[in-house]
């Protein structure tokens, strides 16, 4: 009998999952996984925010399990839009914003990509080099042609701002540009406010369409407003943009898959047409989104006491990550580790490019049981005061051994 499925080829190795599996299979009691993008406490445990537990307790008696509308929970959409754009956003006042609840950041990006592939005449999308590993796959599968613009400078371990402007300046009018709103993944390198303004001017002068990935609002600096600054700058000029939001990191709702796609249009009339077309994308994809995560977020955002408590817990997470950066830098300096490690405290958010080579990274795993992606990215949120010395010792050893 002929087998249709026997001709299926093996899938290519996922660079992040392969590291996670290697760490899982390592029997060492001191193994350390710095590859996954999830927050951990000082004790190395997953964190459920107290305010999330309170919201769930409140919902336990009130929540039904009916289908949501295609565009999701209306209350969630309204509150989520205000969170990213600000209460006083002119785009909101002029009713030219469309928000659709989606399946976290990934789902929001995919719905936006499918919409753009159908309705944007220029099908090329520019993403940073490097960028989150899932970005190219999401956009390619949606039918967009992915190209890259320079972003990270390995020599300075900072932003290649000149290269970025040159590449975006050469992009064709109408091209889509993916911009991470804050806490760039995987590098931890963000533009300054002044650099963002120059990026905005270039994007608008070239008639490019910005698509923001906002996965870490409040998780980078500890301030929800500061981390939305770049997005609001683009919205304030009256132009168009798309924004994918996620509550996986800033509310710890990883498994609830809760996010939203917001599309800022030039007029209310355009927004109405865009809304209907987005729903045509959603309907055959998953029909309606889940209710539980959206209800948690809406409960927290609409209650002033809960919102306040959330901002305190959120700042606590951001501050702990900043502290891990400071401790790691100090530990490397104390050991006299060769090289300049100041980029660790200059970077922001969950991730940092260490600057380690693939050879050094593999040695870290083999001899020191410390796992990170092969490009040298580590999750600062997975470190603790107890494991910083362990990491610093290993980095010092491999850098000294392999120049």
Curated annotation (Swiss-Prot):
Kinase keyword on record: no
Superkingdom of origin organism: Eukaryota
Cofactor(s) the record lists: pyridoxal 5'-phosphate
N-acetylmethionine: residues carrying this PTM: 1
Main location: cytoplasm
GO cellular component: cytoplasm
Subcellular location: Cytoplasm
InterPro entries, per database record: Aminotransferase_I/II_large, Asp_trans, NHTrfase_class1_PyrdxlP-BS, PyrdxlP-dep_Trfase, PyrdxlP-dep_Trfase_major, PyrdxlP-dep_Trfase_small
Signal peptide: none
Residues the entry annotates as binding L-aspartate: 37, 132, 185, 377
Entry EC no(s): 2.6.1.1
Note: In eukaryotes there are cytoplasmic, mitochondrial and chloroplastic isozymes.
Function: Important for the metabolism of amino acids and Krebs-cycle related organic acids. In plants, it is involved in nitrogen metabolism and in aspects of carbon and energy metabolism.
Subunit structure: Homodimer.
Family note: Belongs to the class-I pyridoxal-phosphate-dependent aminotransferase family.
Name of the molecule in the record: Aspartate aminotransferase, cytoplasmic isozyme 2
Organism of provenance: Arabidopsis thaliana (Mouse-ear cress)
